[in-house]
Amino acid sequence: MLKKILPVLITLAIVHNTPTAWAAEAPKTDSFYLPKSLDLSPLRLHNIESNPYGKDFNYAQQFKTLDLEAVKKDIKTVLTTSQDWWPADYGNYGPFFIRMAWHGAGTYRIYDGRGGADGGQQRFEPLNSWPDNANLDKARRLLWPIKKKYGAKISWGDLMVLTGNVALESMGFKTLGFAGGREDDWQSDLVYWGAGNKMLSDNRDKNGKLPKPLAATQMGLIYVNPEGPNGKPDPVAAAKDIREAFARMAMNDEETVALIAGGHTFGKAHGAASPEKCLGAAPGEAGLEQQGLGWANKCGSGNGKDTITSGLEGAWTTDPTHFTMQYLSNLYKHEWVLTKSPAGAWQWKPKNAANVVPDATDPTKFHPLMMFTTDIALKVDPEYKKITTRFLENPEEFKMAFARAWFKLTHRDMGPAARYLGDEVPKETFIWQDPLPAANYKMIDSADISELKDKILKTGLSDTKLIKTAWASASTFRGTDFRGGDNGARIRLAPQKDWPVNDPAELHSVLAALMEVQNNFNKDRSDGKKVSLSDLIVLGGNAAIEDAAKKAGYSISIPFTPGRTDASQEETDVSSFAVLEPTADGFRNYYDAKRNTLSPIASLIDRANKLELTVPEMTVLIGGLRVLDVNSGGSKAGVLTNTPGQLNNNFFVNLLDMSTKWTKSPKAEGYFDGYDRKTGKLKWTASSVDLVFGSNPELRAVAEVYASDDAKEKFVHDFTKVWEKVMNLDRFDIKNN
């Protein structure tokens, strides 16, 4: 009897444990039950425990032990060793790897610094399943033996970019160089890629505009639709999309043309048949047996001559595995007419097209040339036409433009050159790297530091002003692309000196006083020592916080390492730095409603995320900055203390005090008034950013720790530790050594 029942029970168990059942029973996040709940998950990305190498792992030190030439030699071997499970077009994976590197780096966008090659995010969802990244899962699998061989010494982010470089070099193109230093992420980044979740849906709003911070015009694309906007083969409209998308990825017209023309010199597009009819699920939705691969092709052999990627089909040149000028010459040599690929995608072919392109798998077969709608756009658009014709007439200029644009594409999200590692780093510096001058003087020592702190405090500047200035300077840092920060003292330069959040008039007076201290220290010295303004700004903030702690009864000393230098206005691209302007800074209770799409609270989480803060770090930082009275514009919102300027835990104590009743302020949206429950007397004012630390249960849990009677000293030390962290976020000169 048991033998008869057992198969039935097994069958029932299998039926019960279907993916649908698993999905129904899986744990849910708060937002599933409470859609309006605050999402703090971005701040949990900064918990080091997710890194399997551990908290003491230093990637820069590992990379410095790497034999880069040996890695490049191994990559060259992979390039021309075709694998049966995914054969190489023309016997060379070079073009395939260029696409992999390009698409890894090409997600970068200027407005929030997210995307890019750093972190190796192409390995994770959703990027690994974007239609524009179709089949790049195979490219990374081809590289696995190399990654396996060198392990911790080279990250996926570095390996993918290096492979793209080696591919270009092996096919006859001279690159500008390569810099390592991209540390791998260990989970998907949390990024807003667009309002919808349907692949290839239009990212534009109802007015036809692409909202910030987006750069790609359609969901799941790196840049633009190669068939034309939303699949319509209109070269003029495509040019408009190209210009906007590439500009939002930090590229001007010349760099854009160089990248497209240079990249499309190599390889081919794959559209042997319809993707909808032939391809299986993307990696993120494929079965376990696929082991992270996706787009299984059920048509024909499934690869080689039957490969399907974009649905477009063909090559731009007759020699797809060598660098030539054919892309540009073919663009102008032929009259291009609209046609469709075997998969039904819009593309272009020469009028009276001849079969001149060798087949990728059968050397006895030939095909016509082809172009995308986005290629024809470079000939139709007046400005792009000027550049393409100039490049066609000046091949050496084109080569250099492509080399520079490729280097920028693959390194733009790495931040300053101080993060660059390896022997192939170009000696030339570029304005987009936010260059810093080298220090040509001796650094100050501990005695000098004590002397300077004393002199700063004797300038007559209040602790509040010194702390505000240090925060304004250092908090521009964003860990998304490692830009900003105090190093360079660009807060004294355009555009930062005029940002409303920085209270420009007050800032000017503080900087003037600090520069006087700097000049007095530096002049007529015989020991070769100097101090930079950027060091003084941080030192002034540290001295002021130590003084504020002393006033509250605590003796602290904030560690300080000199070495920052001061950039010039000529080393500062005003338009490039403009995107770093905080239109919301919850740490200073500042919010410009006209220039924000996120709420004040969501903006705080976003800024804390860019500052690489955890939930406790953000919480203690808010509490400390509030009692130190550093709000922008002198606002008293959230200054929940009767002793402003003293570093203590009063913000949390008073926020959680049940003797206060909070009501919405009639004076301004997003602000609240706190009244004494017994007397009805107004005690405090606060913003939504302040009250969320008592309203949200997770934030309140942390706030309760710091409001406790036994946490007064803990609060002071935790605050100063986080302060030190923020002041040093841009000190890559220290981190890499």
From Swiss-Prot:
Belongs to the peroxidase family. Peroxidase/catalase subfamily. The lineage of its organism: Bacteria, Pseudomonadati, Pseudomonadota, Gammaproteobacteria, Enterobacterales. GO terms for cellular component: cytosol; periplasmic space. Binds 1 heme b (iron(II)-protoporphyrin IX) group per dimer. Formation of the three residue Trp-Tyr-Met cross-link is important for the catalase, but not the peroxidase activity of the enzyme. GO terms for molecular function: catalase activity; heme binding; metal ion binding. This is Catalase-peroxidase. Its EC number is 1.11.1.21. HAMAP family: Catal_peroxid. One of its GO terms (biological process) is cellular response to hydrogen peroxide. Keywords: Heme, Hydrogen peroxide, Iron, Metal-binding, Oxidoreductase, Periplasm, Peroxidase, Signal. Gene3D superfamilies: 1.10.520.10, Peroxidase, domain 2. It is found in: Periplasm. It catalyses: H2O2 + AH2 = A + 2 H2O; 2 H2O2 = O2 + 2 H2O. There is a cross-link at W102-Y223 (Tryptophyl-tyrosyl-methioninium (Trp-Tyr) (with M-249)). Its cofactor is heme b. InterPro entries: Catalase_peroxidase (IPR000763), Haem_peroxidase (IPR002016), Haem_peroxidase_sf (IPR010255), Peroxidases_AS (IPR019794), Peroxidases_heam-ligand_BS (IPR019793). Residues 1-23 form the signal peptide. Bifunctional enzyme with both catalase and broad-spectrum peroxidase activity. The active site is at H103. The record marks R99 as: Transition state stabilizer. Its main location: periplasm. Pfam families: peroxidase (PF00141). Homotetramer. Heme b binds at H264.
